[in-house]
Each structure stands twice: as structure tokens, then as C-alpha cells.
Amino acid sequence: MWFLPAALPLLPLLLLLGQAPPSRPQSLGTMKLRLVGPGSGPEEGRLEVLHQGQWGTVCDDDFALQEATVACRQLGFEGALTWAHSAKYGSGEGPIWLDNVHCVGTESSLDQCGSNGWGVSDCTHSEDVGVVCNPQRHRGSVSERVSNALGPQDRRLEEVRLKPILASAKRQSPVTEGAVEVKYEGHWRQVCDQGWTRNNSRVVCGMLGFPSEAPVDSHHYRKVWDSKMKDPNSRLKSLTKKNSFWIHRVNCLGTEPHMANCQVQVAPAQGKLRPACPGGMHAVVSCVAGPRFRPPKAKPGRKESRAEEMKVRLRSGAQVGEGRVEVLMNRQWGTVCDHGWNLISASVVCRQLGFGSAREALFGAQLGQALGPIHLSEVRCRGYERTLSDCPSLEGSQNGCQHDNDAAVRCNIPNMGFQDQVRLAGGRSPEEGVVEVQVEVNGVQRWGAVCSDHWGLSEAMVACRQLGLGFASHAIKDTWYWQGTPGAREVVMSGVHCSGTELALQQCQRHGPVHCSHGTGRFSAGVSCTDSAPDLVMNAQLVQETAYLEDRPLSLLYCAHEENCLSQSADRMDWPYGHRRLLRFSSQIHNLGRADFRPKMGRHGWIWHQCHRHYHSIEVFTHYDLLTLNGSKVAEGHKASFCLEDTNCPTGMQRRYACANFGEQGVTVGCWDTYRHDIDCQWVDITDVGPGDYIFQVVVNPKFEVAESDFSNNMMRCRCKYDGQRVWLHNCHTGDSYRANTELSQEQEQRLRNNLI
């Protein structure tokens, strides 16, 4: 980050926020810290603490940016850029001294923060936390002057908001224009407009979830201000005479992700002897909302091409504006390595996508891993760039990045007020219950229930997102065991149908007049939310490498016929004479999410399959289809049901799920379930299909029976050439790995190279 040099006459009264309270000398605390491990510089590494003469580690449970900020300041840096969980910088040795550390963010030492106590932990060294500090260090003389002048070390800017002044601004949602108010030491203050710049406005807008700022009609606002100052009964007039009403001066470069990183002068240089903001008024800011948050018929801030919008995207985030960062290069989507990843680069991504600045820059695949290429590493944005492609970077393959280094972001988004229009009632925890919404009924805002007709996982996902509770683990249609809020049990919303991308249930399609076939009561919609979810992805390359044709005798297909794994024409054959032509392949399904994939049904619902000699826990886990080029189905796999297990896991990770002996079923995070090409029903029966060009398609979790953090990567497609005797699969890829308008041309090129046309 970059800071303007402080003017020496103002040093006693400057608050350099974001570098936060200046660090005190190490001797003032009883705790010593160090950073160790394979970091790229002295500002990052595994965090270790010296206690009772022995170095130990800190567990990553509940560790977040405010804890990292305290640690970095204690180490002499200006603040933290981010932190790393799961022993990114290697597992430590010795004791785990601290667990569940909780800081406000203003402390000068970690020993001033809450925790379980010295050595009280249920963690292992695989959970050792690391930090990445701002490489800029404190300058001793400046730190001492600021520290001595400010006294208590807990002064900081906490929040920023816009107070709408004009009637037109008050009617908008979100509020995009108004006077800047800053929460400082627990109280809201207004900011003097003297010296206020567009750079300051840009930072404020970014914090509020807006990608850019717009010019303000200062002359009009000045007239409004002067009229209030002339009113002898104006409360504002008396308040402005108090220095405690003002933040005297703000100076930002415009690249900062938070006003806490700007220079802020709380009071004038002469303190109480000189009034703050003499002759000035409150600073007014106008922000430009991103496309998803603009009011109807609002004009865009600038012309945005579809190509520009689609060069970066976020995946696997629970909330809008968060996710794993993926960029489009060479017509293929790939990830960004977290080496050198920080808040400034993350903010460029957020603004490019129409959000505000970055609230958090995450690394270590904290929001899940991807398959496919890693396009970028060592991204070094300055903060001025319009797109991530404008920033200096290296190729991801140049410095040993793996997908456990996938970078992610959490962006600031505007407050739309949607979270106040939904609530859960009657559940055993705050994360579950009957869904109650606030809607307008006959001109009056009322709370009521949602009809569970057609209520599914997509709708539940939107509800959990609106509540700020992450993903939906279950969409519940029968809620008789949960008592709703008295007076809110009547159904006020029915026919809800969501695509899954909406910000709120109120944005989904629904009935005009309420029509609920079940009425009220036990059939109100409910949800159970969770902060993490699995993410299943098919290994497309393995499908392409293992596909082949087999003419299998009917005498070997009795079990498969019994399980309905053959096309209907097999029923009319003279068993056991003849054969079926099968397109066989192996499928390997990876769980790249942050939670285990578990079957929806409990053990009581599992089905014993005599042919396979084990239980199947899920009715439809994947669909296998052969399609014409226009999408019509010509053949399909008929695998009746599936057993879920950890076929393989990465080195050092133990398999947890197995089909044998009525074992627990599922797919562990990081592991994969493999269905070999030579097992029963692992095929598509193409006996009745003629030669031609086709699309081979596999869809995982096709009915959305189990929640995932990302459903867009559940489809795998290949181009298929069948000449009546041989089959070729080529250009196999997950459904979202290529940009749509380049997919066809790439397939054409591949076929030309393979001499298939």
C-alpha cells in the first residue's frame, strides 16, 4: 500500500488509519512473535509465539484479518494484508500456544486479545495459522510522535456511511449519494469538505460496495447547507460548532481498499483553540452502483463491453461478491495463484466485477480449489488498474503453484436492505427454521410464511444467502416440528421459483395472488444453512483417455439388465444370444469444496444391490447421455443408483468413506470417487445409434439433491465421433471451463488436428 507523507506540523494530531494504531516497543508486551516457514519475504510466514521460553504456534480457529493486523503491527509492520489457514507455511513443532484468538483490531499486542488461554487447544499442527503483513514498516520517530499525541491506542475509523440529503437520494436503494459520515471511537462524525478530492470519494464508494465515484453538484449542496446555517433553529448549525462533530481532513490516494489506509486528521492542528472546518461544509459523495445493484432504468456509469465483464469471475462463494478468482486466458478459464496476493489486487478484481473494494484477500484455497490451468501468479496491482489483466504478473506455472494456492476475494457490496426482509423461526439453531419473509399485502408490509410447493435447493440457497448464513444444506418442505413466529404463520408468498443467483427471495419469480395447495401450517418452507459446502467436479481428461467400445455378449449382461442399465431394445432380444454395443469409460469425481459430500438419505433409505454386493446410498448421482449436435438425446446411461466412497485421497489424507461392510458413504474434501470403465453399468448403450457426430455428456448431482458451493461445473461434455466401428472423444471439458462463444471454434480446430473431418 502507498501512503502520502505526513506534514510535520500536523503529526501530533494525525491518525494514520489502517496502519492502525502504531506499534509499541516490543518490551511493553509480555509476548514475543516471529514469522517462520517458506514465505517469499520477511513479511509473511507461520505465526509463532514465545511463551515460557519455548516457541509455539497459533491455531487458525476463528483467526481473521483483525487478529492478523494486531500480530503484524506487533512485529513492526504497518498492518496485515491477509492470513493463511491450514499450515500454508508448513506445520510447526512444539506446543500450540493459542487457540480461538479474538481481537478487536486495535490492540497493540496479541496478549491483549481474548483466547482459550495458554496451551488450551483442540487443534493439530495442520491448523497452524500464517500471516502476510504489509511490507512497509513503521518509522520509529513518526510512530512515537503519533503515539504520544493520541494517547490511548484504540482510536480508529470503524465504519463509513452516506447520509442522503436530497429527497431523490433518500428514495434510492441502495443509497448512492449523500454526506459522508465516519464512525470514530463509537460515534458518527461528518467529514469536512476542505481538501476533499475524487480520490477520497473513490475510497468511500469502494468501502460501500460501489466500483466508482461520480461528480457531485457541489453548488447545489452548498445552497442547501447555507440555508440550514441561516436557520436560527437548525440543530445542524449548533452541532457544527463542536469539533467532536467533525473529521477535519482526509487524504487518500484513491487506491486504498479502506479509509483506514488513508491519512486522516481528526482535529485541526491547534485542537480546541481552532474550530474544525471553518467556512466548510460536510463532504458529499456520489457513487456509481455496479450492474447488479442499479435501480431499474438507471444509466451505467460507463460503457461496459461483455468481453470486459467476462474476463474475470468468482466461483464457489456463499455470498454475492465473494469466491475463488478465475480469469479467462487463451479462451480457457483458470485460477490465480496466491503468491503475492493482497487487498489491492483483490480490490481491482472486485471493482472490475462491479463491486466495491475488497474486504478480504483470501489465499490457500480458502473458498475451494479448481481443476484446470493456473493462469496467473505474483499479481502486483497498484490499485489504479481497471482490470486484473492491466496488472503486472507472472504465469502461474512459473513458480510451482498448485490449486491449494488458489486465490479468492470477499468484496464489499452495497447494503440493499434485503437481509431485513427475511428471518428464520423455530429452529434448533440460528441457522435453521421456518422461512418468514416481509412482503407488501394490500399496501401494508407484513411478515408471513412461504408455501413449500416447488420449494427446492435453489430457493433455499437464495434464502440462506439473503440471511447471510452461507449455503443451504437442506430445503425443507415439511416443518410441522418448528413453530413459526406468532402472527406470521399465514402464507404470504407462493410459487417461488429461483434461478439460484438472486440476492433475495423477493427477486425470484412467484405468484401474484397467493396460491398454496397445502395451506398454512406444517407445509411452510424451511431451510438449514451452513457456512461450507462440497463441490463436485468430473475429471474430464480421464473420460477422454479411457473411452472405448465393447460388444458385450448378453450372457454377461443379466445383472445389468436386471438393473435397467440397457436400452429398451434389449428387452426384445433372444437372450442369451447376441450382444450390446457399449460406450465405456471411467469417471473420476473430485470433491474440491470445503465440506464432505454426503448422500441425502440416511442409512434407512439405502438400497441393497445383490449384483454389486453393497448398498447404494443415492438414487441418481450422475447422468450419462449421448446427444445430437442440437441437444436431442439419442442414448443414455441407465445406471440405477450409486455407492459413494473415497476411492483415492491425496498423500497424507486418510479415506473416510467406503461401500464395503455397510460402511459410511460419501466423498471427503480433497478425495475422489472413481467408477472404473470395467464395472457394470459404467457405460452408455449405443446399440441403436448410427454413425455420426455427437456430444457425450455427464452431469454430476443432476437433480441438485445435495447442496454444492458451485453447480456450474457439474456438467462435463466431449465431442464424439462414431463411425460405426470406432469412437473418438475429444475436447472433453467441464461445462464452464471455456467461454461459450469460443467453445465451438475450439472444437472445430481440435477435430481438424485429429483428422476427424
UniProtKB/Swiss-Prot annotation:
Cofactor binding note: Contains 1 lysine tyrosylquinone.
Protein's UniProt keywords contain Glycoprotein: yes
Keyword Cytoplasm: no
The protein's name in its UniProt record: Lysyl oxidase homolog 4
Native species: Bos taurus (Bovine)
Disulfides per UniProt: C59-C123, C72-C133, C103-C113, C192-C277, C205-C287, C252-C262, C337-C401, C350-C411, C381-C391, C451-C516, C464-C529, C498-C508, C559-C565, C611-C659, C643-C649, C671-C681, C718-C732
Primary subcellular site in the record, as a coarse category: secreted
Region: Lysyl-oxidase like, residue numbers: 534-737
Function per UniProt: Catalyzes the oxidative deamination of lysine and hydroxylysine residues in collagen and elastin, resulting in the formation of covalent cross-linkages, and the stabilization of collagen and elastin fibers.
Domain SRCR, chain residue ranges per copy: 33-134, 160-288, 312-412, 422-530
Enzyme Commission numbers on file: 1.4.3.13
Keywords for this protein: Copper, Disulfide bond, Glycoprotein, LTQ, Metal-binding, Oxidoreductase, Repeat, Secreted, Signal, TPQ
